[in-house]
Regions:
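C-terminal alpha-helix
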Residues: 84-88, 267-278
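Conserved beta-strand->loop/alpha-helix structural units within folded catalytic cores of enzymes
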Residues: 37, 98-106, 258-261
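A short loop-to-beta-strand scaffold at the N-terminal edge of the catalytic core in hydrolase folds
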Residues: 14-24
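Flexible "cap/lid" subdomain of the alpha/beta-hydrolase fold that forms the substrate-access gate
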Residues: 43, 58, 63-95, 104-248, ...
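An N-terminal hydrophobic leader/cap segment in hydrolases
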Residues: 1-12
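Catalytic histidine-centered segment of alpha/beta-hydrolase-like enzymes
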Residues: 252-261, 265
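Conserved HGGG/HGGXW glycine-rich cap/lid loop of the alpha/beta-hydrolase fold
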Residues: 24-67
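The conserved beta1-alpha1 loop
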Residues: 32-36, 99, 222-223
Length: 282
């Protein structure tokens, strides 16, 4: 069997430009799943189990989070996602399922290559770089966001240039403070590079990221029990009234698919099946 194609149990693994992409399930619709901090493709284990009877689920661990380059520029990430989409679904556009930093990278890919994306399911990150979001935060919320993100960016920097052990300890401490459900043993400071891109311009930075204006249908699911939101009320209200789109708030924190798996997966299945959701925008 070629190195770029192998199987493990019920999963098929292909390698695209040095990145392993794992496929599982059946169906003509291909759902490409992108995680964020501080996760890996394992974030989607439950979601794959819930959807694999109706679609083919494809997932990867973002470059640099476990192995590979220390940081991936935005242009390179979009190019990689295009290569993956072309490989796993050459004849039809994919459905994106996104969380956290996966939303930022996935949104950018969808806006640059709309012909390759049929629709999007996004979790907990909306108009992340809009003026409306910044204006919606109180001073305390702005300081909270800057505080945790700069801490993680610093942990990445220290891990790269001073001590990996120190960087890892700082990262795991912040994950505990944020009540992250990910196994601490799997969390490392490598996973923090998007924060260094955001604040310090690492690997070209993220100032080139477009405002979030998707041309395809979008289901946006978010946790309502958080000290701050990553969407503006203006963006949420507009999305809730847009044809083909839906908004669903669930009583939990940032990791919606882990905190409220049954409700999340039922919502996603219904929307993918074309059912009208009882939209909840809080």
């Amino acid at each position: 069997m070629p190195e770029s194609l192998r199987t493990t149990g019920t999963e098929l693994c292909i390698t695209v430009n040095g990145t392993d992409v794992w496929l599982q399930g059946q169906g003509d619709e291909v759902v490409l799943m992108l995680h964020g901090w501080p996760d890996t493709r394992a974030l989607w284990d439950g979601t794959v189990a819930a959807l694999q009877d109706r679609c083919t689920c494809a997932r990867l661990t973002l470059p640099g989070f476990e192995s590979g380059p220390s940081a991936t520029p935005l242009d390179d990430m979009c190019q990689l996602l295009r290569q993956i989409a072309d490989r796993i679904s050459p004849d039809k556009p994919v459905t994106l399922m996104l969380h956290d930093w996966g939303c930022l990278f996935g949104y950018e890919f969808a806006m640059r290559h709309p012909e390759r994306v049929a629709r999007v399911v996004a979790v907990d990150i909306g108009d992340h770089n809009s003026g409306a979001l910044l204006r919606s935060w109180s001073t305390k919320q702005k300081l909270s966001v800057a505080g945790y993100q700069l801490w993680l960016a610093l942990a990445w920097q220290l891990g790269q240039h001073v001590s990996v052990s120190l960087g890892n300890r700082m990262t795991r401490a912040m994950a505990r403070w944020l009540r992250c459900p990910t196994d601490p043993a799997r969390i490392t400071c490598r996973m923090n590079y998007p924060y260094a891109m955001q604040w310090w311009g690492l690997a070209g930075g993220l100032k080139g990221a477009a405002r979030v204006r998707l041309s395809m249908p979008l289901l946006y699911v978010y946790g309502t029990r958080k000290p701050f939101m990553f969407h503006s009320p203006k963006w949420l209200d507009a999305l809730a009234t847009r044809e083909g789109c839906a908004v669903q708030g669930l009583p939990c924190g940032h990791w919606v698919m882990l905190s409220r798996p049954e409700a999340f997966h039922a919502c996603v299945r219904d929307w993918l099946d074309g059912k009208t959701l009882s939209t909840s925008a809080t």
